[in-house]
């Protein structure tokens, strides 16, 4: 993992999320719900929800990083647990701030498989070492 960290100002964040929403819209993807990965994905998911007109937002609290450059061996879901109700036909957009190693996104995608019709991922930043290649960056 790179030691270099980028500070994202509010202005840069706003631009990044608008561009991310435009990528999703231009692709023609119309998610039925957005799943935020807490904590970094909370604001991303909320902003995408407004921009894309998606009112169904879910939150999944996954712990992988325990500090700067410190992480667990594997991601762990923390309570309260996500409970999808009658979502077999739903298209879901998973939102997070960054795909660093990609392990969190891989965990969340695996969790969603079989519970929804389609899963796509959207992040503000994707690192080169990420094992997951996100649909929208």
Language-model-derived ranges and their functions:
Residues 1-137:
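PRPP-associated nucleotide enzymes
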């Amino acid at each position: 993992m790179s030691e270099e960290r980028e500070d994202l100002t509010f202005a840069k964040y706003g631009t990044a999320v608008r561009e991310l929403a435009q990528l999703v819209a231009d692709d023609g993807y119309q998610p039925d719900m957005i799943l935020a990965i807490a904590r970094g994905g909370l604001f991303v998911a909320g902003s995408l929800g407004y921009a894309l007109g998606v009112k169904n937002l879910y939150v999944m609290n996954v712990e992988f990083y325990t500090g700067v450059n410190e992480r667990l061996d594997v991601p762990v879901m923390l309570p309260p647990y996500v409970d999808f109700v009658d979502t077999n036909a739903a298209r879901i957009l998973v939102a997070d701030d960054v795909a660093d190693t990609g392990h969190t996104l891989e965990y969340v995608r695996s969790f969603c498989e079989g519970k929804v019709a389609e899963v796509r991922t959207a992040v503000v930043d994707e690192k080169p070492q990420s094992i997951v290649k996100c649909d929208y960056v």
